[in-house]
Amino acid sequence: QQFSSQTLAKLTCLNPVQLRRVTTVLNQYQFIKTSRGKNGGYSANHSTASIKLSVLYRIFVLEKDSQQRIFTGHEQSDCEISRNIAKTMSHYNQKEHRVILNFYDTLTINDVINDTLQEDTTYDTL
């Protein structure tokens, strides 16, 4: 099934501009099919359902070029804490990403779809 960006944005309650940014990246990696023109839109392809969330996490989180400084401290400081805190927090951050990647490596787009569709009925029985 093919959806225009406007229709897809309405179905997912997302901003169409943000959605197009994501679909552009997904198309670059050939995770979806995109057709241009009056009747253009987006659709899943043969591999969409089996894409691991760890792959998407790498693309949308880890590979983003971040210029912001996320850890404080100064390596030339006389204060031991200031001198080492950035390195320590960087190690923690790397471990955090490994945990997340390991978790997401067990999930695919198909899992997200199935779990999302089950959410509507999960709380009806509680």
Predicted regions and their residues:
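Key DNA-contact positions within bacterial/archaeal DNA-binding proteins
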Residues: 17
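Minor-groove-contacting beta-hairpin "wing" of winged helix-turn-helix DNA-binding domains
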Residues: 38-45
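Short, hydrophobic-biased segments on the C-terminal half of alpha helices
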Residues: 23-24
